[in-house]
Structure formats: structure tokens, C-alpha cells
Amino acid sequence: MPAVPDVDEVATLARQLRAQLVRHAAAGTWAAPGGRSPRPARDEAEPDVPAAPRRSLAQVRAELGECTRCKLHTTRRSIVFGVGAEDAPLMFVGEAPGEQEDKRGEPFVGPAGELLDKMIEAMGWSRQTVYIANILMCRPPGNRNPQPDEVAQCKPFLDAKIRAIAPRVIVALGRPSANTLLGTDAPISVLRGKFHDRHGVRVMPTFHPAYLLREPDRKRDAWADLKLVIAELDRLGIAAPGTPRG
């Protein structure tokens, strides 16, 4: 006749069983009847990758250093990191610095920047109350479009800036910005006019101010996009520091 376990042994086995059941419940992997393998939870196949730690903008800038991660460092004058409020609920992301931005080390300071300032002010905000950045932080020669290897080196720092600022809404200025932020190759004409979700942040693609200077008839469409941003911020309970015009 097999030995009967004592009370302490039974209590220990019971605690181990309860712990095992709790682990299975948390993982969504209860044992199935008849010895069949349990059906995996919906996200069980994905590795448990911890979220990147949130750093301050100063920490992100310090990590960037005097960046030499891509070939653009050989032709740039300045690293154009970004400008604005470090806790801005509204962020604008463009494409890359131009000649004036490269000289001054600040995004959107040329003619396109003057137009962007007017657009932001028309929404009731300012350069000081939003945050402005670009996909690339170094000027591409001849103001050409960003190349994939350049974007790949800059994007982790853009992601870190977005985590540091934690905006509620991002306005993506132009196709390269929208494509990079949203992971798509769709044209801006398809993406604009509606919100897209990026890890819980609302993204509104619209035309780049430089394009609007070349095609002023599209300013009406861009303003329609920005009015949607104003309405979304209002829905989120975020008041602009000023009063929008019109």
C-alpha cells in the first residue's frame, strides 16, 4: 500500500498547483482536455520585448552626439535636432533641413518655415508651444529626398524624441514624413484628410509647406486638414494657447 503523504506535503503540493494554474491563466494557456496542446494566446507567438525607456530630449541629444552614423555628416553644417516645447501636445514633423536650416541649426526657418509659422499661428499655437522636427537631422545635398539608409539611422532618434515629448497629435508634413511615421508608401493625396494611429498617437498627414509655396491652390486642402487637428485637440480636451482665426 503506497505511503500517504503527510499534511505539510499536501499543503506544499496544493500551493505549487495553484501557482501553476495562475501562471497558465495569466499566459492564456490552460491545458486542453484529452492531452491536446493548448491553443496559443493571440499574441503568444510574439516575443516579450520590453518598451524602450523614455528619455528626456536632453538625453536623446546627448546620445546623438556629433553624429556620423550616415554619409550626410560629411556635407552638413549643423545637426538640426528640433525646436519647441518639450511637453508639447502638438508636434509637426517635416522631411529634412534645407539650406537655411543647415546654416542656423533650426528646423523650418526658410520660406517654407515662414509659411509653417503662419499655419501654426492660425491654429492658435506658436513655435514655442508646439514641437517641430524633421525625419532627417542633416541636410541632404541639393535638398534631395531622404534615402532609406539615412532614414534608418535617424528614425530611432525621431522615435525617442516622440516618446520624450509624448504629443497627443502629430502633423506629418509631406509624403516622406507620413510614410516614415506610418510605415507606408502611400502618396500624401491618399493619406491626408484623415487621422491615422501610431502607437496611440493621432497622426494627420498633410502637404509640406514647400509644396504649398509651389502649389498655392492646395493651401485650402492643407487648412482643412489643420481644422481637423484643431477639432481633435478640442475633443481630447487640449486648449490652444491662442484663438484660431477663421
Enumerate the predicted regions with their spans.
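Charged, compositionally biased N-terminal leader segments and the immediate start
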Residues: 1-16
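A polyanion-binding, active-site-adjacent surface
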Residues: 2-3, 18-246
